Structure formats: C-alpha cells, structure tokens
Amino acid sequence: MPAARAAPAADEPMRDPVAPVRAPALPRPAPGAVAPASGGARAPGLAAPVEAMTEYKLVVVGARGVGKSALTIQLIQNHFVDEYDPTIEDSYRKQVVIDGETCLLDILDTTGQEEYSAMRDQYMRTGEGFLCVFAINNTKSFEDIHQYREQIKRVKDSDDVPMVLVGNKCDLAGRTVESRQAQDLARSYGIPYIETSAKTRQGVEDAFYTLVREIRQHKLRKLNPPDESGPGCMSCKCVLS
C-alpha cells in the first residue's frame, strides 16, 4: 500500500486565503490572476509573453483606515475584506488588459501609520503613479491628502507626477466630505477624482485603470514636451462611478 501522506504539524501556520504576495521576487501571474506566493510553472496560453508586457508600478497611499488594502484586494481577488492587520507594506501583481494593451500591474499597498512615515520615501521613489485615497466619511483623511501629495512631489523632485484622487467608502452613510470638495481639490491638482466602494467594487477598476492611463499620458508628455509658449493643457477629469 502507498504510504499515507503525513498530516501537517500542529503548530504549522494556516495560509491566509487573502494573504498578499510579498516583494521583491515575484513570479509572473497567469492572465487576470494574482501571482502565487511560491514557485510553480506559468500557466499555458498567456495572452502575451510576459517579456512583451508593459509593467506599471502603482502605489496606494492614504491615512490609516481609509480602505487602501480593501481596494487593492478587491481589484486583485474580487473579494471584500473588512478585517485585516494594519498594513506596513504589501505587494501585489495582476495581469490585465487596459485599452487593448496587455499589461502587468505591480501594486504596492502602503501603511498610513505615522511611525512608518520615513519608509514612504523609499517606495515613492520606485512608484510610477499614485492612488491618493481618503474616506468620504473621514474629513481628516481628506485633509491629509495634501501632505501625501507634497511628499510624493518632493521625493520624485517633480510637480508632474501621475496621481488619482480616490474617495473611498462611498457606499456608507455619514458622508463628511462632499463630492464637490473633492472635485475642487482634484481640479486644483490637475488630476482625476474617482469615488469608490471596496465593498461593492464600485469604481475600483476605474480608479486603478485611470491611474495607468495617467502614467501613459505622463510618458507621452516626456517624449513630446508641450510648447511652453502656448497655454497649459493640464485638465481634470472627475469621475463619480
């Protein structure tokens, strides 16, 4: 008779079903799937060779408790989590198709805790675009957006950094930040504004995909600088999904 498979040790930790992939070394995922935490062969039939895909490095920033991790996990796994340990730094990957382009999203979900503020410079240096998230029922988190934006600009040494302002928890009652306030702030920054619900998935894909489009436009601007003698063309696209 074949030998029975050994039972796992009693003290062996259970795998968290929504545990993120940890940076830095990550295998490439199959289409539309989060990369596995450990090895394994790549699934056949990829829409495009991994080497041919454009990779976009996205960073999610915002105050503690605004739903940064919930937004990211909803995008990656189509699942809402309302209880999880406070994030310090988690990395996720997903292959998607945006406007006909197969691309790989490398998403860094960051902490909003002040004691880790010094770590932000490091991950902001590598990020290409930033989701600046606040909760529509938390005025302080909205006020904190200015601080995050200024830190991003300082670290990137540029006023032209791809960003999207995200008002999360739009499914909840008790709104304290009106849509018009957020739209006005986004307009003053020259960036899009999108309202989301990590619980219902409303606006989640739109927020991340819009950021990818902002990164593409930023790259085009660097390749083809606008005529400095003409009027500026920075515009704000506010999307209330």
Swiss-Prot record:
SUPFAM superfamilies associated with the record: P-loop containing nucleoside triphosphate hydrolases
Lipidated residue numbers (S-farnesyl cysteine): 238
EC number: 3.6.5.2
UniProt GO MF annotations: G protein activity; GTP binding
Catalytic class of the enzyme: hydrolase
Start and end residues of each stretch annotated as Disordered: 1-41
Keywords recorded for this protein, A-Z: GTP-binding, Host cell membrane, Host membrane, Hydrolase, Lipoprotein, Membrane, Methylation, Nucleotide-binding, Oncogene, Palmitate, Prenylation
Regulation: Alternates between an inactive form bound to GDP and an active form bound to GTP. Activated by a guanine nucleotide-exchange factor (GEF) and inactivated by a GTPase-activating protein (GAP).
Lipid-linked residues (S-palmitoyl cysteine): 233, 236
Chief site of localization: host cell
Mode of membrane association: Lipid-anchor
Protein's name according to its UniProt entry: Transforming protein p29
Domain of life of the native organism: Viruses
Modified sites of kind Cysteine methyl ester: 238
Family of the protein in this entry: Belongs to the small GTPase superfamily. Ras family.
Keyword Amino-acid biosynthesis: no
Residue ranges listed under propeptide: 239-241
Additional remark text: This p21 transforming protein was generated by a transduction of rodent cellular H-ras-1 gene.
Catalytic function, reaction form: GTP + H2O = GDP + phosphate + H(+)
Subcellular location per the Swiss-Prot or TrEMBL entry: Host cell membrane
InterPro entries: P-loop_NTPase (IPR027417), Small_GTP-bd (IPR005225), Small_GTPase (IPR001806), Small_GTPase_Ras-type (IPR020849)
Signal peptide: none
Cross-referenced Pfam families: Ras (PF00071)
Taxonomic lineage of the native organism: Viruses, Riboviria, Pararnavirae, Artverviricota, Revtraviricetes
